[in-house]
Amino acid sequence: MTIRSLSLLACCLLSALAGAEPPATGLVFDGSHPWAVPGKDVALNPTAFSFATWVRVQDNKESQVFLNQGKAGTLTSFYLYNGKVRMLVENKPGSYTFAMAEPPQPGEWTHYAGSYDGQTIRVYRNGKLAAKTKAAGSLAKNKASLFVGSLNDFERFLKGDLADIRVWNRTLADSEIAAVYAGETGGELDNELLARWTAESKQDTQLASLPPGTLTARQLKMGSLLINEKADGFHGIWYYNQKIPNEYVYKYSGGLGTYCAKHIPMAWYAPKANKTFFCYGGTDEQNSTLYHMVSYYDHATGMVARPTVLLDKKTTDAHDNPVINIDDDGYIWIFSSSHGTGRPSYISRSAKPYDIDKFELVWTGNFSYPQPWYMPGQGFLFLHTYYKGGRGLNMWTSQDCKTWTKRRLLSHIEMGQYQVSFRGDGKLGTAFNMHPAGKGLNWRTNLYYMETKDFGKTWQTVDGKTLDLPILKKDNPALVAEYQSKARNVYMKDVSYDSKGNPIILVVTSGGYASGPANDPRTWTTARWTGSEWDIREAFKSDNNYDTGPLYVESDTTWRIIGPTQPGPQPYNPGGEIAMWLTKDAGAHWEMVKQMTANSEFNHTYVRRPVNAQPDFYGIWADGHGRQPSKSRLYYCNQAGDVFRLPEVVTEPMVKAEKLD
């Protein structure tokens, strides 16, 4: 070892022992655009390379990438995932290995480094070796771009800061990693240095490496994910969840393009355009993937727009279905969900107000069961589920959907819960159940309600008592009705308001999760706040827990429900024949005033209510076979109960739907 090397080693060790000073400033990554070095410029050594960077994140639970080459799970990635920092290497074709370290604390600078030598992956935290994993092999030859702060141009964006980012075409020794952590530069640390990016590197739309590094990362347009093409017709996704060994085959299944009740809203009437815009989960003729589709009904002409294919979610899971919002300026927002944390979620905005021809990707991250609400003059109050030890109910707020407040947990009772929400006059309310500890998600019970009148800053019970959040115990002031001791499951369907702002909640209760008569009765039930107490009344019955339809509060005493309450061609599977029910005494008595479909080929499922629903486009749903894969068609109805089927083949910009006899 040379005297120079010994001096460097001594300096490294002394610096590491003393502790390094975190950077004063870094490069800000807000998810608004990706940065990448073109693949032709990268040329990583397939058996010897190293990464290092200071990291400061806003949230250490989100999946976020520091440096990446290749698609997810390929080539190499230095990233935060599932609460750990990973150094991943695809050391054999189609097979990857990783080493991982503890995550950074939100808002605090932490230094990470990773290396690979053809035999071992190492990851370092604050200058010290944190983990190593055997991974004999090498990277495949490639010309993939090196992304900084994201997986690619639309996924897993870093939300925070990076500083002193370095890339080498060799494997650094432990002592050299300690020196980098200590802020050392030059000498041996310049050997095979491909890139060093600091706050001084940013030059408009480029990150120019400090010498002797040569790589330049360029700002890319965000959004190659988006398709923005016209569909050839209206095709809904078919999906099933959990096979069951009986004649009903699945826990739930069918044409689920408008699934589920916890994805709200899926349609929105815009008065200035006199159009109801809607989204749904679409597919191709093979049901091979889930497309997010956007269309509208023109109330002036009675015609429907040829749907726009927004994006391919690369799954057939209907839990990834989209929802829609429209802001004060008429821009259409599509929130693309994910089932859990394994896939990314997206937010897109129309390029023009009241126009579906082109959308632009605005944000990528993760959320499930999306319930965003544009609150006039305030912005977006986004209720959603985040999978962390169950199904916690969370919220964000934002003015532009690019920058969000820190995710705030509202409730996580035992194993979590599901919710339904809707806007009232100057407020937003949510009704939810809970999953009892130790029993799993198939068990859900009890009914709760809370609301906010100040854009989510505080939340109150229905009688105005401010809640201490998050709600963590099943016995709490938000409780509407207790069902656990009665061994009744509670399935959330809808919430609406009367003229005084009093909420009315719609649920279905049952004896258990499995399809079939053993868990009868499935009872549609309303819970109305009278101003002094909850008035809970049973309405009528159907044959499946996942029979879903909305509650239309047309006056303080006249309410309407449109849903698949009548047995369909696949009885005891989700959905059935659509019927219209009416009460004129605030839920005391209900009458089925019209059976809207009959002798159907498939069950009809998940009727959805537009925001500001208009009489000529009052609800939208899909159909599909309840016990085997099938095609799925889309329908809408008017307030009178007439049903219209959207065409499976569309070639013109605007089309008429077929009215059913």
Which positions does each model-derived feature cover?
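Extracellular glycan-associated modules
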Residues: E21-Q219
